[in-house]
Amino acid sequence: MLPVAKTSIKSRVAGFARLASLALASAAMIVAPGHAEDAPTPAGHPAPGDQSPVAITQVSSLPVERQIVWLTHAARSGELERLDDAQLIELFRALAPDTLSRYVQTGSARYREYEFQTFSQQRVKGRWQTKPAHMLVRYRQEPRQVYVKWLADGRNAGQEMIYDEKKDPDQLYAHPGGILNLASFWVPIDGARVKAQSNHTVRELGIDYFTDLFLDELKKYRAAGVEKPSQIEVLNDHGARVVAFTWETPTGRPDFYAKKERLGLDLRQPFFRTSEAWDNDLELFEKFSFTDVTLKRFDDSVFDSKNPEYRF
């Protein structure tokens, strides 16, 4: 489980002054709906003293579209990251119910071609993977193309795979790590070799998968009367803080993806940096972290097994 971040109240006054400033700036902007990413960064406004109630009220009173604009600018400028734990929790409790889901949707729209690293642990065939897999991933959303390398400090080190739906939507090309890495072969994306390592296919490696999963589950949460997360907290993930939202379902699986799910929002970018899920016995069955997420423009060699950088 992710460690709880330590909260300091030392910067509370300055933090809420910044919060009030950003709220005032956002309220003054005229932005077309759905184009928050295109809006100019608002100029700062001086704000006196500790304006905790005022700042939160200003942000929470904005319509959803303006809250998304505000959140986008606060993340990009680093203001969101500079708020302390208590301020972050209070802020996200005050936002409109639809703001979080609409905000992370902007991340899926923006991050369509990117490189990242991921740490993953899963319960596969009833057994928990005690050592995380640490992978470098190069990902293109459309057409779906994925290159993955298992890094030296994680499980299955040295393994590589490439998936290109243009060549074959049902198979991937891979080689194992270690002394067996001389042999490369085609395998079904949901075949036995893949399922021995993961409950997910290569098509489910991107941050968009976890966003889409959250959006689908959110509809089911609300249909079941679960209107808001049971807990909002600030946790640490690989040296970075996340705002973590825990959702608990009345019946669990198979009606829902998990009995309990916790998603950690990145403070700089509009996506979930972490995802954890528990089964009906409240045993953790998967844990994912995404780090070093960087927008890229890939050429065709990135998804070609003949790339001299690779060892196929």
Roles of regions detected by a PLM:
Residues 1-15:
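N-terminal secretory signal peptides that target proteins for export/translocation
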Residues 41-49, 54-58, 151-153, 162, ...:
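Gly/Pro-enriched, hydrophobic low-complexity segments
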Residues 86-106, 185-193, 215-233, 243-244:
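N-terminal short leaders/motifs
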Residues 87-180:
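N-terminal mature ectodomain segment of secretory-pathway/periplasmic proteins
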